[in-house]
Design a protein with these regions (language model features):
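Metal-dependent nuclease catalytic cores that hydrolyze phosphodiester bonds in DNA/RNA
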Residues: 1-72, 86-88, 133-141
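Active-site catalytic microenvironments for nucleophilic, acid-base chemistry
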Residues: 9-13, 104-109
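A structural signal for short, well-ordered beta-strand segments and their strand-loop junctions
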Residues: 49, 70, 74-78, 112-119
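Metal-dependent nuclease catalytic regions and adjoining charged, substrate-binding loops involved
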Residues: 59, 105-211
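Short beta-strand-loop-alpha-helix junction that forms the active-site gateway
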Residues: 78-90
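Flexible, glycine- and charge-enriched loops at secondary-structure boundaries
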Residues: 88-95, 157
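An active-site-proximal "capping" alpha-helix that borders the catalytic cofactor pocket
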Residues: 95-107
Length: 211
């Protein structure tokens, strides 16, 4: 999407990267050692990997993933989302799962045990940020800015591989089943949000029709 394209473009333009690092106070020697998507890393290099796809074969399947950014051993991902998804942390487990699979695919590059999620809020409101009060211990405060970053713990490589194997085993067991015998997808698999059912009463049923 546009967000990822813009982020990739900003990192793969070497002049922009050098200028930004210098503005951030990096020494000229450090800036010179920054290498974007290097095929090999020499001593003293500071490798940064942007939008790289990797795949791995397991149990007859190919697992593939393309991360946004890996820097200093940490995987980073950009998310354009609503403020309430952030407040309620409704995608927390998905982010952990996604980051864990990236690490499983790239254990040589992703060496840290956390994923950094960089949020860009599509519905942020300064008025909401001033009045919102934290309602529950497991929720985040309404973000003070239109962007925010949060760190999440990753699974171990063993946990990730076990999850992948279990999912592949389930898929394999369904391959020969007739359509009517297949299990229905869960709400999570269908991306159905909780408590989103809405019912409306219309005094005039014709008002529900569209031209």
């Amino acid at each position: 999407n546009a967000l990822h394209t813009a982020c990739e473009a900003s990192w793969t333009d070497s002049k922009n990267v050098a200028a930004a690092l210098k503005l951030a106070g990096a020494a000229d020697s450090a800036v010179a050692n920054v290498k974007i998507n290097p095929e090999t890393v020499k001593e003293g290099d500071i490798p940064i990997y942007v939008e790289q796809r990797c795949e791995k074969e397991i149990d007859g399947f190919i697992i593939s993933g393309k991360y946004d950014l890996v820097m200093d051993g940490t995987v980073h991902d950009y998310k354009s989302t609503s403020t309430w998804a952030y407040v309620n942390q409704s995608n927390r487990e998905d982010y952990i799962k996604q980051g864990s699979i990236y690490k499983w695919l790239n254990p040589d590059k992703i060496t840290n045990s956390t994923v950094q999620i960089h949020y860009l809020f599509t519905d942020w409101s300064i008025a909401e940020s001033r009045k919102f009060k934290k309602e529950s211990y497991n929720k985040e405060e309404y973000p003070a800015l239109k962007v925010a970053t949060k760190s999440y713990p990753l699974w171990s490589l063993e946990e990730t591989e076990s999850w992948i194997k279990n999912r592949l085993a389930a898929i394999t067991s369904y391959l020969e089943l007739p359509q009517e015998s297949l299990p229905e997808c869960s709400n999570d698999e269908l991306w159905v949000r909780k408590n989103t059912e809405k019912y409306k009463y219309y005094a005039n049923a014709d008002s529900t029709h569209r031209a």
